[in-house]
Amino acid sequence: MSMCMSLLYSCTTDKGLDKLAPAYQREQEVLDGMRTKLEAHQGYWRMAYYPDEHRSYGGYNIYVRFVKGRVEAITELDMNKDSSSYDLVSIDMPTLTFDTRNEVLHHFSTATEYFRNARGGDFELLIRGNQADTILLEGRKTHNQIRLEPINVEPSQEIASIQKVHQTLQGKGIQPMTIGSLSGVQIALYSTYRTMEFILPATGEDGKATSIKEAFHYTTNGIRFYEPVSIGGVRISALKLSEDASSLLDESNGLVFKLTTPILDFYRNKYAVKLAEGSASLQFYGSLRSVNKEMVRQYGEQLSTTMYLGSNTASDVEASLEGNDTSLATMLWHDLNDTKGKSVGRSLSYEMDFAAHGDNAQEINFFAIDGNESTFWYYYDRSVKPWINLFRRYSPYKVEKSTSDGVDTYRLTSTKDSRYWFDIKAL
């Protein structure tokens, strides 16, 4: 954008200032022009939306259509749709505001018991200018850049492709690789909160590795970073999923990010863990006893000794066990019992990502995400968070399979401390 980008004032000479219309009039002309542009497009606009000033939740595609002062919004998360009013006003500068409640547009700006300060979503978007047909916006609170691009297809078509890419990348590891002048770059993919982390090899006298994290949003054929990542003299803006879905490709730089498929698929399966002698190490079932002692003291309830890992099911959703952003999600959860070990009819769950560790399909990383609102995690957080931290601290885990009487059992042993292990079985 040039120095003459101002939406309210054109570049002019001092002699021409007296010919300018009053500021409020120029302001209104800008707002009216933007309203006309938004509503003149008969289809939807694709909005690449990043909540939170640190973009720690990644980016999301939201599809919006503007008609007669109302906006209809559809989210890529679950294709939910909602309609509400919108307005164009001047708050310091021209602003697109979603001024009445909309379940899609206010999803990340809604405070809950767990997300007490919401998740940093913006619903007042500063109008920064245009780039061809694209409208450039900026979140008032986060200052995140947001692009509004017109599309001429139904959102359902794009969303189907976006969700397919997302599902393909769930649980995938990425093999270490050379990027530009740096070799041995390790990469972690956080598929749920849409972030990629590049761990750079140790350099200098301190010998410490450094890392770069960058948020991205899914596209119809891959991912696009919020802003280009610079590594080893190379700038990476977007990655395309290869036709055989075995790699992510940076076609502009000729880079191939080879994907690793883990031996266990937590995104399509549900596994059970019996936290007791013989099926888990003392380090785990002993820690559960300590957590439960505190749970009983604080709440008169305790976690069941059976733990579940992986994806919840439709029947779990019916029992109010669901994710924060989508009904189905990957998580770690327990049934809640009373002091006598009888179920109280509720669960307690924490969302997690489970991904192959680098190029090793036999090792699984546990990435903690957030406690689930649906199971009132916020109420128990102080007592139970150490339990989640334990699994995260000793990740990744090496997977070893054994079969007895036709039943497969997988032993997961920490690669950091072999005293920490537990067995899981698919349900």
Map each language-model feature to its residues.
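N-terminal glycine/threonine-rich, aromatic-flanked beta-hairpin/loop signature
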Residues: 52-93, 183-221, 290-371
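Acidic, serine/threonine- and glycine-rich low-complexity intrinsically disordered segments
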Residues: 154-322
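Surface-exposed, polar helix/loop patches in the mature regions of secreted/periplasmic/lumenal proteins
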Residues: 88-132, 254-256, 262-271
